Each structure stands twice: as C-alpha cells, then as structure tokens.
Amino acid sequence: TAMSLKCKILLLAASHLLNDKEPYCTAEPQEAVINHQVWYGGYKPELWKACLTACEEFFQALQVNGHYELVQAVGDTNDAYRAAFNKAYFLRENSELLISTRIIGKYNWDWWYYWGDWVPNGGYTPTLEYMEMFPMATGESFDFDKAVQNNNMFFENNDYNKPTRDPRLYETILVNGAKWSGRSVELWVGGRENANSTSTETGQYATGFGLYKFYKEGKGSLANNYLEWPYLRMSEMYLIYAEALLKNNQPKLAIEMVDKVRARVGLKGLIESNQDKNLLSDSNALMEEILRERACELGLEDVRFFDMIRNKRADLFERPLHGLLIERADGGSGSWSDKPEDKRGPFPTKFKYTQFKISNSARAWWTNFNSKWYLSAFPVNEVNKGYGLTQNPGW
C-alpha cells in the first residue's frame, strides 16, 4: 500500500499545478513561488518519469506478491457489473481496496454520519454534466439528443430491467426509472419522489437526479452495514498508471490500462468506443478520456475536484452546471405508483426533458474565476507567527 500511495503522490507532484512553464498564479505575494514551494521553476518531464517508474515498481511487486486485483463480475449482466463495482468501493475485505478510511464500525441508531442528513436537503446532488459523462452500456459516449430521440436516456421504455448506460451510472446516480424500494423511482415533476424538488431547485432532487453511491436508498438502508470510505483502489492505480504512460509518450499502453477498468463493468475499449477520435495520436483527447474515466469510476472518492485543480482546469470551474427537468409526456400527470391501481393508467414510458442552468446553488467561480483559488489561503494569524510559513500566491 505504501508503494501505491507513492504513485498517487507523484501523480500530483508531476501535474500542471506545480509542474508547468509558468506558476499557476502570478499575483502577489510571490514568496512561495520564488522559494519553489508551489512551483518547480519550470516544466520538468523527469517528474512524470518518476511517477511512471513508481507505477512500474508497484505492478512488478504486485505480480510477485499477488493479493490485490480488480473485483470482477460473476456474470455479464448489468446487475453483475454493478455488484462488482459496488463490492469494490463499498464493501470491506475486498481484493481491490488498498487504503481506506474507517471511522466507526457499523451504522446504528446513535452513529449516523452527518453527511447522510445533508442528502435530503440537496447535498451531493449530481448534475446533468456528471450524468452525461457516463457512456452507453456498449461503451460509446452518451449523446443527449440521440437518447431523447431513441427514448433510452436511462432505460428502454423506462424499464429498470433494460438499462442502456454504463452500470456505474446506476450505482452512482439515482436516475428516473431506476429500481427503488422494489419499484421504479419517479423523478419526473410531480412524481412520487419529486413533487416539486426539481421545479423549485431545492431538496434531494433539485437537479432532477439523486445521489446513490454510498447513500443507497437512504440511511435506513445502511443500518448495520460496515462503513468503508476508499482512499485508494486498484482501479485508480490502473488510471494513475495510464496517465503516467501517456505523459511518457506511451499511449497504446495507457489505453490498455484504462480498458482494464472499463472491462470490469462490461464496457468496450476506448478506441472501439471512440472511433471519431485519434486517441493514439491526440494526447489531449486521450487525457480527456482518462479524466472522464476517473470521474465515472471514482465519483465521491475525493478525486474529481483535485483532478480539476492539479490540471489547472479553469475551463471546468468556469462552466455553469445544469439540471434536468423531467416531465411526463404520455398524457398523464403526477405520481403513477402512488395512485390506486384502477386510476394509474399505463406505466409511464415517455418523457419530456428540459435542461436548465442551476441558479439556486450557482457557484461564484462560474464568473471571474481566479487562479489563486487552486490553493486556499493559510490563516493570516498562522502566517504571522513567523516560523517560516509563507502565504499561497494571490492571498
């Protein structure tokens, strides 16, 4: 596990935030820049070589000693792939978990995690942009307009037994029509779970989606389960290795590492799934695919936010995020499952989808983004103690 942590640290050390031709922030104070505490003074490709070497040493040691490996599905169904992914991130004592955080033993009546109470009030609500990152079940990139036209946004005919997307989507985001308490969850406006949450941009389904990863069907569904917060899994090791290979001009091997992670959930390889892209020759395109794979595989595992920072992705910080307003388009209205059987009518299978810019929880950095925000400020009182701590640039 120490070798795996070394790889993760060297990935950050080699990334653009610290390792670039220019410092990430040129505003005063610049003492930390001049002292090379937040910038190496230039781009150093040898740092990517060091990361690659650490990855190679890790996998060589793994080949000799064994034990750690990706959790694999026991079948080729969406449920089997979901079960493998669930075991990898959620259950203790699996072959994939390298480093984890454990605070308490099990959920019980007096040991609720406070984060679980934030979810019903809109905490951790997924966005449209995140939903769109998950590919189709075949591996091809998701196309919103095509999904609307084919009526297969999440399932065929809103049947949770016929999923159309990456199995990790359903294990990460609660989407309309997903199986929930033995029935289809109703996230359309007026639905059983979503009376007005999306239309008012408040509550658990403010964006038209709900959180599923770690939260499952609510705190009650987690009772008496062991708690597991993964910090580093084998899937991330393959993706770290892929990035290091790419930065050392080995795109073919990089793609092979990513494909190992995708194959675990039944997705085709990157090249087959992205025939409109030249992934072997376009390093920027391949880097985007690696970052997307990290977002889909490692959601809510403290990865995406720091990926955006270490790669200085001001473009992503400045991009306004959206939700998805879902309405029934079958002539019916309101909840279906909550009505008496003789008044339900046909099961809803057609919907109208309206994208909307999030306004109730808009972020300050969508406008006037400042690169100083990549690293937070140290408290002034701490800097003024005079023991050598220097303030980060721009603060």
Predicted regions and their residues:
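Residue-level signal for alpha-helical context at structural boundaries
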Residues: 24-25, 187, 253, 272, ...
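Long, intrinsically disordered, low-complexity segments
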Residues: 32, 41, 73-136, 224, ...
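Intrinsically disordered, low-complexity segments enriched in small/polar residues
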Residues: 64, 137, 180, 188, ...
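Intrinsically disordered or highly flexible coil/loop and linker segments, enriched in small
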Residues: 178-182, 267-271, 296-300
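Active-site beta-strand/loop architecture of penicillin-binding DD-peptidases
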Residues: 190-233, 394
